[in-house]
Amino acid sequence: MYGTWFTTGKVTDLLARTGLDRVPVWVPVVLGVVLMAFVGSVRIDPALQGWVSVGTVTLLLVLNRRRGRGITVFLMMLSLLVSLRYIVWRLTATVQFSNWLQTALAVLLLLAEAYALMTLCLSYFQMAWPLRRREHPLPEDMAQWPSVDVFVPSYNEELSLVRSTVLGALDLDWPADRLNVYILDDGRRKAFHDFAVEAGAGYIIRAENNHAKAGNLNHALAVTDSPFAVIFDCDHVPTRGFLRRTIGWMMADPNLALLQTPHHFYAPDPFQRNLAGGMHVPPEGNMFYGLVQDGNDFWDATFFCGSCAIIRREAVMGIGGFATETVTEDAHTALKMQRRGWGTAYLREPLAAGLATERLILHIGQRVRWARGMIQIMRLDNPMLGAGLRWEQRLCYLSAMSHFLFAIPRLTFLVSPLAFLFLGQNIIAASPLAISVYALPHIFHSVITLSRIEGRWRYSFWSEIYETSLALFLVRITIVTLLQPHKGKFNVTDKGGLLARGYFDWDAVYPNVILAGVLCAALLRGVFGIVWQFHDRLALQSFILNTLWVVISLIIVLASIAVGRETRQTRNAPRVSVRLPVVVTDAHGRQMEGHTHDISLGGLAVGTRLATPDMVGGEVTVRYDSARDGIHVGVPARVLDARDGTLRLRWAVRDLEDERQVVSMVFGRNDAWAGWADFAPDRPLRSLAMVFRSIGGLLRRRPAEAPRALHEMGEGELPATEEKLEKQSFVLKPVPRSARHGATASAALFVAFTALVPAAMAQEAPSPDQSGVTAETPFGDSNTGVVPDALPAIDPAVADRISDAEVTRTLTFRNLGATTGPLTLRGYSPLQGLDVVVPANRVVTHAQLTLSGALSPSLLPEASAVTVTLNEQYVGTLKVDPQHPQFGPVSFDIDPLYFTGDNKLNFHFAGEYRRDCNDLFNEILWARISDMSRITLTTVRITPERKLSRLPAPFFDPNQRSTLRVPVVLPATGDRGALRAAGLVASWFGRIADFRKLSFPVSTTIPASGNAVEVGVNLPVDAEGGRPAGPMLAEVANPNDRWGTVLVVTGRTAQEVEVAARALVFSPDTLGGVASKVVSDVSLETRHPYDAPAFVPTDRPVRFGELVGAADLQGGGFAPAGMTLPFHLPPDLYTWRGRPFLMNMWVRAPGGPVVDLETSRVDVSLNNNYLQSYTLSPPGLWRKWSERLVNQHAGAVGHVTALPPWLLFGQNQLQFNFDARPIDRGACRRTPGDIHMSVDSDSTLDFRRGYHFAEMPNLSYFAEAAFPFSRMADLSETTVVLPDHPDTGTTGAFLDLMGFFGASTWYPAAGVTVMGADEVAHTPPKGDIVVLGTAAQLGGAASGLLARSPYVIHDRHITVGQRMGLQGIWYLFQDHDHAGLKDGVTANLNAPIAEAGVLLAAQSPYDSQRSVVAFTGDTPERIHDLVLSLRNKGDLPSLQGDLVLKNGDRFTSYRTAPVYTVGSLPLWLRLDWFLGHHPSALYLAGLAGAGLAALGVWAWLRGWSRKRIARDDLTGEL
């Protein structure tokens, strides 16, 4: 949309019609920037951010297909918005300062990212609107054309290199009397002087070589007088039209001090020449000269680049000449002129061409000089300071200077994953999902937008290779120059060198080779960590993420190393591919017309059908004429090869005139370099493929090359020393062009000079193709480990017979709690144990322990063993057999008298591997007890003791870990009072059971065996059938089973039954040691929201000691068993932008010389998610003494730990694991093992920064903590709707649900309201509502209660209802947090509920702040199964969204309903929440901001562009 408007003028027309075109352009810019900043700072959930990212990326891909500067500006704004969101997220959500090392590494990475973002912004600024200046016409009257001095400075270059440049300059298409070409020879070589005389060029030397090139130029300015000076490096040969196409701007704008043209290189740079895919990639310098300089021209900030430029003498002399303070005199000179108010310009037409650096090491040396110079400018003459520059110019210079600071950030990005893989420091504290949805869009937008901007000038991912090739060399230069800016000298870059054979330049790549080795080691470490080390999910993801990061770094480094594989360079005259019409005349006068394939200063290849082999060795004349360029060539050449219609010729240059003609043909054509940008537009995937191809070239074996002797390559023998001129100031004036031929002919001493022209300048015939070797990049496997075979299922042979006879059960150690694998005992951790539970109503008559495992074969048999005890009573010993380290099965009989209710089965390891001294931490000290070891118990029931004081026994055994069943007898299941009383009793049992599984099977008669609870009106209270005399509790024998007990809760009325139930659950300690008792009512205090005993208070800090006993926070040994702190929270706690809650933890370790506190640590985890590790080292001496005076925690080590809200649920557990190390006490010194470590019970949890606010419906809140019903501990704001006549299955589900509520709140459900379905129509339920029953039982009440649910249950199917009007639109455009859940609309939900349970959540139709949760299904049994799932931790993750379907063991979750909220927030936080939870609104606001900013910027840039060129539209597309 934006692109179409920007390119077609629709926006301009619309603004003109509405009058908005008169609004200043800064208004939409400011509005857009403010809106972008606001949107960029909003924090949203990673899943929602993912949708926003998908939207922005999709828009990017769509708009990127359209052309136009307007679209480009909009995409830049969009990229900046995405990057802003990323950097705000990095700064506010991913930074944790856990220790000094992590802090340093995290800050370093943040600084590198800030640098990268600044560079991105500056790049967009520079390249937002390339000016695309065209040539300005010269005056028609040539008499007005100015005189021009052409300077060719030289120091130590070869004469063969300088000759072409001088001859090309002498051949410039400019009036001869106004063209003065000078060789500025700081080498004072006589050969150069003689060449200048022969060619008719001027020659200038000076007495002292002060200030290198800048001093040379300043000296030349002092001895010449033309108003304009043109500078060419000695290898830059101009086209004939150079002056005609450039001087026009200098004449048209008298304030123009400089006009720069591109530095084009006709020879490939090291990256093109050495990389396998390099020749298909634009040269490294193309982006600067093709795009950056053009963008600088827009801002009047063109840089002088030292060559191929025109300088106004007045301007440069006005600043005291060329700058000499830095080694980059060119850029500094331009800066000084711009400070004085002079303008600069850039013409993006390559009008000269030179040689690129042939070898990587030379390229690095050149870039090191550039980096030093730019940093010197930043330190000595910072463009951001001082007067004379506009802010736009300052930013352009800031971009140039800061670019050469890339070394440290680039290295930081490459090695950052090593912090985690080698040092264990997580420097980006975020989940992989969050990193993906924030970082990847930032990178993607940057890459694609830059790809669009840079197009054919620079391919994606190649900047990384260029920078990495230099980074390690520049690190030292960067730091040294920043600290000592005056250091450093000007170094001349060698060019025109030859290589006899290819080789690997270790000097140029050895730092990257070392870095690659380190990255390979990190890669192996990452793979090892992923495959062979045990991690929780986040740790595993961190390993994967950092390993992928290493792979990316390694790809970049390998590509940069591949540049060091230098290829053979046997031609000192590189070929230029060009098709020119030529005429070849042989010795017999036969003329052959053809076209060149390539040409060079050494020769050419001509395609002609008349080429015959007999021409080889003969001499021909090559003619080329171009009237347009004023070039006429007729030069002899020798035929080297003639076949396949191609003549390969070597120039046979006879004199200087022939050489001039060759130079003119090769370099002088005005369109010689017009194809400098003829590269395919960038496509990132293709560019990436080229990177891999280049890496493959590094790994591919190169065919053997026979080295060529120098004379074979045409390199003549050079004299050992060159003849020098005297050190003095000397000026030889150039000879006018008209007088040159006579002067040259009369100079007999130069007749032999042409013999010095190297024979190797001829074009060599190409060697036969020897590339018949194919190479295939090896892609090995991922080093994933072999998955071990699954252990065979072992039948535990459980014989669970319910009778008076003996019952035998076999339990594996896995059944006893060894769920993580074998019990491992070590020297520093010699004790491991398990709990063996015997039911309270049974005694053990026989027990046998069967063990298997292994003992270290390195142990001494006579001094090593594992001792087995039960309740500190000896059971047996496992002895060491070095020949057979594995043992078992070994059986031990256990005396039944050793058993109690809860029994401790312990294994104590004592091991020695040498007779004198043993290191407890030596890895050979180990023993393992298999988790498939087992214990077999034979038990019998004992006669029950029926006393109310023993309640909840025998119905509940606290030592039991298996599922508990409490049968409930309800003679009248439809009695509301009895249901409330039974629900109250069930919730009491649920509170007692807590985390244990518990169910209440309901019947109308007493079961045939076992225990039961009977609730009802006027029930028998003794064996004789006596009736209650009031509210009464009684324990009586099961009439069907003398071993069973029935607890009777009864009364004469329904009200008395409820009184009896309240007395049972609220005052069981007052019942006494009697079998029956008439009880009185209990008065209850009014409950308040969130005061459930299970919930940690959120209005004050909570001591650990309030949650667990001090003994639970203590452990013995150097590596004691993990300590846990369970706690419950209301799941609706909300913090601003997910700020973490705080835990103030104090740990205590033994004093004295026992534990090495510096290396010992305690690991803290939350819900099995690792949080942090802390040293046990005490505080400093001053702090230690001050704490003794004022701190209750004196002697303890304190730490503050952040508890992320996303790791907190309804039920939580903090884990503390100590890992201590003993102090080295020397040889044969016993290390005390009976040490104790603890977490101080006065440590606190603080949740005060949380607000009670939640998005609903959310069944996970209900499954975790019965929310929102648990908001009131007694369920006084909860109504349960049951069928009017519930059957036993539905009633059992109701009681199970009450038990679940009691376990969630730790408070009986004394205030719950129970009503029938038929009552709903005339008495609307209050508060939050639970609906329980099948669709058939509930009738029409279900549809009314679920009126705001999107689901409809009809004809034994559940579907998404048909919503009309605005409600339907809301369903279509609502924002979802799916979290992987299905949407009922998009999934076209139409599921049968036969044999299925249905759990539904919806907003209450009676109160928008209330909720409805419905349990329904096809049969009561399915409902009952669904309620039982709430007690199964394995099923809790499946209970999410607003709809759960349970078919057998399979759960399917949906989220379809619109979100509503419960709770309250301050106004400011509510606004933040709204934007953070509506990604579509955030997305549209972001697009609006980017669009406004882009519109204003586009209009501003367009106007500035026209102003920049002084109203002369010569710039092409605007």
Swiss-Prot record:
Gene: bcsABII-A
GO molecular function, one term: cyclic-di-GMP binding
Membrane topology: Multi-pass membrane protein
Positions contributing to substrate binding: D233, D235
Free-text note regarding domains: There are two conserved domains in the globular part of the catalytic subunit: the N-terminal domain (domain A) contains the conserved DXD motif and is possibly involved in catalysis and substrate binding. The C-terminal domain (domain B) contains the QXXRW motif and is present only in processive glycosyl transferases. It could be involved in the processivity function of the enzyme, possibly required for holding the growing glycan chain in the active site.
Major enzyme class: transferase
Region annotation (Catalytic subdomain B) ranges: 314-374
Protein name: Putative cellulose synthase 2
Organism: Komagataeibacter xylinus (Gluconacetobacter xylinus)
